[in-house]
Amino acid sequence: MKARTDNRADLDPSSWDPALDAVIAAPKHHKVLFENERLRVLEVTLEANDEEPVHHHRWPSVFVFDQVQGPVHDFAPDGTQLPPNRDLIKAIEAWKGQGCLVVNMAPQPLGRVFNASGKTIHGIRVEMKANR
Protein backbone atom coordinates (compact mmCIF):
# COMPACT_ATOMS: atom_id res chain seq x y z
CA MET A 1 0.00 0.00 0.00
CA LYS A 2 1.62 3.27 -1.03
CA ALA A 3 1.31 6.50 0.92
CA ARG A 4 0.41 9.77 -0.71
CA THR A 5 -0.15 13.36 0.22
CA ASP A 6 -3.75 14.44 0.67
CA ASN A 7 -4.54 17.35 -1.63
CA ARG A 8 -8.30 16.87 -1.31
CA ALA A 9 -8.47 18.90 1.90
CA ASP A 10 -8.68 22.21 0.03
CA LEU A 11 -12.05 21.37 -1.55
CA ASP A 12 -15.06 23.33 -0.34
CA PRO A 13 -16.77 21.15 2.33
CA SER A 14 -20.19 22.59 1.41
CA SER A 15 -19.83 20.82 -1.97
CA TRP A 16 -19.29 17.38 -0.40
CA ASP A 17 -22.00 14.77 -1.06
CA PRO A 18 -24.49 14.76 1.86
CA ALA A 19 -25.10 11.02 1.32
CA LEU A 20 -21.48 10.42 2.41
CA ASP A 21 -21.80 12.37 5.67
CA ALA A 22 -20.47 10.30 8.59
CA VAL A 23 -23.89 9.80 10.19
CA ILE A 24 -25.46 8.54 6.95
CA ALA A 25 -22.54 6.60 5.45
CA ALA A 26 -21.14 5.14 8.70
CA PRO A 27 -24.06 4.99 11.17
CA LYS A 28 -22.62 2.02 13.10
CA HIS A 29 -19.75 4.28 14.16
CA HIS A 30 -21.45 7.70 14.48
CA LYS A 31 -24.47 8.27 16.72
CA VAL A 32 -26.09 11.73 16.92
CA LEU A 33 -26.51 12.77 20.56
CA PHE A 34 -27.62 16.34 19.87
CA GLU A 35 -28.12 18.55 16.82
CA ASN A 36 -29.35 22.04 16.10
CA GLU A 37 -28.58 24.69 13.46
CA ARG A 38 -25.16 25.49 15.01
CA LEU A 39 -23.85 22.22 16.50
CA ARG A 40 -23.93 18.48 16.01
CA VAL A 41 -22.66 16.22 18.78
CA LEU A 42 -21.67 12.68 17.80
CA GLU A 43 -20.69 9.66 19.83
CA VAL A 44 -17.97 7.93 17.82
CA THR A 45 -16.98 4.30 18.39
CA LEU A 46 -14.52 2.22 16.38
CA GLU A 47 -13.73 -1.24 17.73
CA ALA A 48 -10.21 -2.66 17.64
CA ASN A 49 -9.27 -3.90 14.15
CA ASP A 50 -12.48 -2.44 12.69
CA GLU A 51 -12.78 -0.12 9.70
CA GLU A 52 -15.34 2.58 9.01
CA PRO A 53 -17.03 2.85 5.61
CA VAL A 54 -16.00 5.76 3.37
CA HIS A 55 -17.42 9.02 4.77
CA HIS A 56 -16.57 12.68 5.47
CA HIS A 57 -16.93 15.27 8.24
CA ARG A 58 -17.82 18.58 6.59
CA TRP A 59 -17.54 20.81 9.69
CA PRO A 60 -14.63 21.69 11.97
CA SER A 61 -14.91 19.99 15.31
CA VAL A 62 -13.51 19.35 18.74
CA PHE A 63 -13.03 15.63 19.36
CA VAL A 64 -12.98 14.52 23.01
CA PHE A 65 -11.58 11.00 23.26
CA ASP A 66 -11.98 9.02 26.46
CA GLN A 67 -10.37 5.99 24.85
CA VAL A 68 -7.85 6.04 21.97
CA GLN A 69 -4.61 4.34 21.08
CA GLY A 70 -2.57 4.09 17.90
CA PRO A 71 -1.97 2.98 15.34
CA VAL A 72 -4.95 4.44 13.48
CA HIS A 73 -4.77 4.65 9.68
CA ASP A 74 -6.62 6.93 7.26
CA PHE A 75 -7.33 5.78 3.71
CA ALA A 76 -8.63 7.56 0.62
CA PRO A 77 -11.71 6.02 -1.02
CA ASP A 78 -9.42 4.31 -3.57
CA GLY A 79 -7.51 2.53 -0.78
CA THR A 80 -4.34 4.64 -0.79
CA GLN A 81 -3.05 5.32 2.69
CA LEU A 82 -3.17 9.00 3.65
CA PRO A 83 -0.57 10.78 5.78
CA PRO A 84 -1.32 10.55 9.51
CA ASN A 85 -3.54 13.28 10.94
CA ARG A 86 -0.73 15.29 12.51
CA ASP A 87 -2.92 17.02 15.11
CA LEU A 88 -4.26 13.69 16.33
CA ILE A 89 -0.87 11.94 16.29
CA LYS A 90 0.81 14.78 18.22
CA ALA A 91 -2.01 14.78 20.76
CA ILE A 92 -1.85 10.99 21.26
CA GLU A 93 1.94 11.13 21.69
CA ALA A 94 1.64 13.86 24.35
CA TRP A 95 -1.31 12.26 26.15
CA LYS A 96 -0.55 10.39 29.37
CA GLY A 97 -3.64 8.18 29.00
CA GLN A 98 -5.48 9.77 31.92
CA GLY A 99 -8.67 11.78 31.63
CA CYS A 100 -9.72 12.80 28.15
CA LEU A 101 -7.74 13.68 25.05
CA VAL A 102 -9.11 16.80 23.32
CA VAL A 103 -8.20 17.45 19.68
CA ASN A 104 -9.18 20.36 17.41
CA MET A 105 -10.12 18.86 14.01
CA ALA A 106 -10.44 20.54 10.62
CA PRO A 107 -13.14 19.28 8.22
CA GLN A 108 -12.15 15.83 6.98
CA PRO A 109 -12.66 14.98 3.31
CA LEU A 110 -13.90 11.64 2.04
CA GLY A 111 -11.98 8.71 3.46
CA ARG A 112 -12.14 5.77 5.83
CA VAL A 113 -10.43 5.01 9.12
CA PHE A 114 -8.96 1.67 10.23
CA ASN A 115 -8.29 1.11 13.93
CA ALA A 116 -5.16 -1.07 13.90
CA SER A 117 -4.79 -0.91 17.68
CA GLY A 118 -5.93 -3.51 20.16
CA LYS A 119 -8.24 -1.02 21.86
CA THR A 120 -11.64 0.47 21.04
CA ILE A 121 -11.60 4.14 20.03
CA HIS A 122 -14.39 6.07 21.72
CA GLY A 123 -15.16 9.74 22.01
CA ILE A 124 -17.52 12.64 21.56
CA ARG A 125 -17.12 14.82 18.49
CA VAL A 126 -18.65 18.31 18.64
CA GLU A 127 -19.05 19.58 15.07
CA MET A 128 -19.45 23.33 14.62
CA LYS A 129 -21.70 24.19 11.69
CA ALA A 130 -21.25 27.51 9.89
CA ASN A 131 -23.29 30.41 11.25
CA ARG A 132 -26.45 30.91 9.23
Report the location of each language-model feature.
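A short, N-terminal "cap"/entry segment at the start of jelly-roll beta-barrel domains
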Residues: 1-44, 48-54, 81-110, 114, ...
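Short, conserved beta-strand element in jelly-roll/cupin
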Residues: 56-72, 76-78
